[in-house]
Amino acid sequence: MPDPARSWPGAIVDSWLCLPGHPVHRLIAPFAYTFTTRKSFDMALRSIRSVAVFCGSNHGASETFADDARALGRILAEAGMTVIYGGTTNGLMAVVADAALAAGGKVHGVTTETLHLRGQSHPGLTMCEIAPSLQLRKARMIELADAFIALPGGIGTVEELMQVWSMNQLSEIDKPVGLLNSAGFFGAFLQFIDHMVDTKFLPAAHRHSICVEADAASLVDQLRSYTHTDVPKWL
């Protein structure tokens, strides 16, 4: 059953939760559980109960990518943090999920109806939701998570990372963002971000508003100590 501190408009089917717009939801929505949203919490001590992990649906060229993904899943589970991810059985996404589950942690998947119909939904998750579209999938993951970590991945991973980074920049959310720089994967990406700073398209403070570490445990520690700073977007 979902955390009562969360608010969600879906309906549970076994361990699955279908979002509005899904055909099953229209049938059983009248019988759905409802919860109230927690009104406030102490921001002085950042409590991270859940972390959305963005990463590749492939394993990548280096075994280090999978090793670091496995370490992250275990560390999040041992810290009592629920892993929020894309809900599939593919690539680094599955590596993180399986490692967290093996360590006794909770894993909450959010997949799309298209991927679910292709048989790509992970069958062993604590909970998995079916979103009608990719956009709603991302929105739901952002809603569920208290923090975000990006691992090596493709354009989908970069898109998810940039969306939450931009939302923090505009103060639409106050949730820390981290990069697990496995095997130096994000080195060229960070050089490009530095180029944005050098060419006066990005304030330097925003460049340093994300946490970057090559070690999963150190990255999680950084996220816990993160403090949001309001910086004007325009130079």
Question: What is each of the regions a protein language model found here?
Answer:
Residues 26-42:
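Short, Lys/Arg-enriched N-terminal segments with co-localized hydrophobic residues
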Residues 136-171, 178, 230-232:
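Active-site/ligand-binding-proximal alpha/beta "capping" segment
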Residues 17-19, 27:
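Leucine-biased recognition of intrinsically disordered, low-complexity hydrophobic segments
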Residues 39-144, 182-217, 222, 226-235:
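A cross-family phosphate/adenosyl-ligand binding-site feature
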